[in-house]
Amino acid sequence: MTMDAFSNPAARIGFGTLDLLQATEYPMTRMTQNYQLLTSLYRENWIIQNIISTIPNDMMRKWYDLRTSVAPEYLKQMTQLERRTQIRKKLLLGMCWGRLYGGAVGVILIKGHNDMSQPLNLDTIMPGSFLGLHILDRWNGVYPEGELVTDPEDPDFGLPMFYTVRNDETGTMVARVHHSRVIRFIGRELPWMEQVTEQYWGESEVEAIYEELTRRDNVAGNIAALTFRA
């Protein structure tokens, strides 16, 4: 095995020297796991707010254009259902919290489906029984379980089979939800091992730009401070 590298010990540059560039490291921070920092950044920084919300807002702005031969009265009923369940807003929130925290879910609520640990059977959904989506971010009481989907024909192959929804204040389990009743929203895709580390969620969109953001804020703050001394 051969390796090529540049080195100039006299000038202290290149491989194996005391060059300042050689001291640069990229430690694994996993900032996505810092809920308090992400929340604080989102609430206080307009740049972060725009990074999180711009793409979801663009995706949802025109909603959808349905071309069908279905009778107009049925289309009206569907529009009324969308308004009643606020499905457009719920999907927007799911995408935003997925981008901010790296993961969120939308639990599909169906009237009469009390045992949510059972797979969702579309044939058993009666007209008017859709109750909407319940959005939970990854820090809001939803926990992927260790059992994974093993059917390669399933769209969720390799992802958790069940999700536990808990009341974190009391520690009690609210529901055990089958993956077919869950819509996943994640941030940036991660390599497999990192995905496992993040409990099968993704990476926050904030993590990749955090260092640049701190540089910008520090420079802007210093410039503002200098105006008082001018």
Where are these regions (language model features)?
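Glycan-recognition surfaces in beta-rich domains, encompassing non-catalytic CBMs
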Residues: 64
